[in-house]
Regions:
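Active-site recognition of the HExxH zinc-binding catalytic motif
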Residues: 187-200, 221-225
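Single conserved hydrophobic/aromatic residue that forms the stacking wall/gate
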Residues: 1-6, 10, 292-301
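Post-HExxH zinc-binding segment in Zn-dependent metallohydrolases
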Residues: 213-251
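Long, amphipathic alpha-helical stalk/connector segments used for oligomerization, subunit docking
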Residues: 236-291, 295, 299
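Noncatalytic, helix-rich "gating/capping" subdomain that lines the substrate-entry/channel surface
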Residues: 1, 7-57
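Secondary-structure capping and boundary motifs in well-ordered enzyme cores
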Residues: 32, 59-62, 131, 165, ...
């Protein structure tokens, strides 16, 4: 081990850590978990399209029970939420998250109330019909604009946008297009593009190793939300490309850059986290954590 360099030690330690945890899970129970994950994904999509939560509810219940079971195998005696948190944000604990969210909520509640009490802009123009094919063209424009390389990736369509990578040279972005909400696909493209650019810039020497993967979801999400909010909601970001956006999406020709800029920064209450504005987005996360805390300490729902 004395001859290992930093990156090699990272790979070794990460593999050992994951292997020790995974070995504690009975194979047959893990197989049940994987099958239910696949079935749950299909049920969620069916429920979403039918607007019927009852289709997904039993699968959600099973997944919660199985997730708690897996956490009990990997870290027995530890709070379930802390076990899961450590998978996505290594070394983080719920006490730190609670403190952070408490400060955030204290500052955000009066701010949101003040904003919502003000006169709201008219967003009628943004609910006209926007051809999904035109939205795809705008998406491709924006991905190219922010630096996503199609030579090292691809773009597809799914019910829920996400980014998937198999190496730094094969990074796949997905999106969803709503006929009466063009901004959704635009900002999903910018957000997922941020994730993808992170992956495309990983040193190829570290592809498919722990040194080339991000063990801190906060780091990865900081990149996607930097592109989405710090860049994408800045008026200067759109000045070089807005006329091209209008060319690709004819309905946008009746919407000035100032109107567009106001709409992409419009603060409103919403039910969907991924569609939330920059200000209210945090409440979706805080609410989910609150739902965990108001139930049994080790429950997930």
């Amino acid at each position: 081990s004395a001859s290992l360099v930093g990156s090699e030690m990272c790979i070794r330690d990460s593999m050992q850590r994951d292997m020790e945890k995974d070995r504690r899970i009975p194979k047959d129970r893990y197989e049940v978990m994987v099958r239910e994950q696949a079935e749950s994904g299909n049920a969620w999509e069916d429920a979403k399209n039918a607007s019927d939560f009852s289709i997904f509810a039993p699968h959600l219940e099973k997944m919660i029970a199985l997730t708690k079971e897996m956490a009990g195998y990997t870290d027995p005696g530890k709070e379930v939420y802390d076990v899961l948190l450590d998978k996505y944000e290594e070394g983080m604990d719920s006490a730190t998250i609670d403190r952070l969210f408490g400060e955030l909520k204290e500052a955000l509640i009066p701010l949101v109330k003040k904003i919502l009490a003000a006169k709201q802009p008219d967003d009628t123009k943004f609910h006209a019909y926007f051809d999904p094919d035109d939205q795809r063209k705008v998406q491709d424009l924006l991905l190219s604009y922010i630096g996503f390389s199609k030579d090292a990736g691809a773009v597809g369509e799914t019910e829920h946008p996400f980014t998937l990578n198999f190496s730094s040279k094969d990074v796949r972005v997905t999106n969803h297009y709503y006929e009466h909400d063009p901004i959704s696909a635009m900002f999903s493209a910018i957000h997922e593009g941020g994730h993808a650019i992170f992956e495309q810039n990983v040193n190829p020497e570290y592809d498919n190793t722990a040194a080339g993967s991000c063990r801190y979801m906060g780091v990865h999400e900081s990149q996607s939300r930097f592109y989405e909010n710090i860049l994408g909601r800045n008026k200067n970001f759109w000045i070089p490309v807005y006329e091209k956006v209008q060319e690709l999406m004819p309905q946008m020709k009746d919407i000035s850059l100032d109107e567009f800029y106001r709409e992409i920064n419009h603060v409103r209450n919403s039910l969907i986290r991924t569609e939330a504005d920059e200000v209210t987005y945090c409440f979706h996360i805080i609410l989910r954590l609150s739902l965990i805390h108001i139930s049994e300490p080790t429950r997930l729902a």
